[in-house]
């Protein structure tokens, strides 16, 4: 036994030298980037795996990476950093809005400050559509005339564009609104350049619409920009219950979308017709300066349970304060009465609307199509003025936000909170007095018309989160 002891010690030493490094040593290694590519890989504005437009997402693969890591974008004489996120497609990061166009190095750093190897990408500035923004209250050409909405293309004339064009021609339809995306991750393949080209060949405008939730506004804006890049003649934002209370998200979405497409591209909003009933929805952001130029409230009188006249009047009264041209979305689904469809067309023509559209192609029966094919019968007399929202102390909601954004320029003591508080009440009374109006503390027609002449004071909703 004594003679064999040195041999055993030597073997133990060799085993020690050959043993793998402990896990703690591996953790001390810096992160490693192995691949960068666009999200989604088929995106129009992400033309290759290493060429991406500012504001787009990138998917990052590598070793020792995790959610929350610092991601740096570096170029000569500049750098920006953001955080790595994890989604269903893996680890993703969005190219910051102020990144310089050109060749950029991307690295990630862990909590200890260890930096990965650099991967080079090419960053493009977002394309801009030239021309000045239209005058407030002017309906862009893309929304003029009659339109029909398509939810599922395959269930609308079985997706046959020639049949769609024939039906549209017979019904006087000039614009087709086709769903292009849902949320920030679901791009609908039915809206594509081939469809746009085919509709154009038949003399139809092809507009895209996207349903938004506000959970990932930058991704939703990117998908909207994708539809525009596919050739859409206009884009409509469909924001409903899911967007209530999400002012910061709405501002992020609009800012990102306009940064990509410019101020002139025609954008519309479709949502609930009764602003006071959905008081937490950020109409004032979607319809405010630099945002949508067309307001397409969903005036579904049969579903709402009122007459065409009553529902239309309340819709106009509730929405007119935003100063955005109104092109209402009417109801041809649910066996809508052809006489109601005719009345709706005549009434809104009397209100001066230059555009109407209908929901939806796949749910419209033959009697409704026949009603659309008839000429509009003018009203014997102009419709009565529907009035204006009467706001007073204690009221809450987006209409109060809009009022406060105007009054804040008259009286800096007014805070934009959405609550008609004592400061708002006093400012309104002082304003009424200064304009020679009846001092009531309530927004009647004359008060609204005077208040809306004040400049809109901007609000940074993103800083309030």
Placement of each model-derived feature along the sequence:
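Acidic, Ser/Thr/Pro/Gly-enriched interdomain connector segments
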Residues: 141, 151-156, 376-418, 457-465
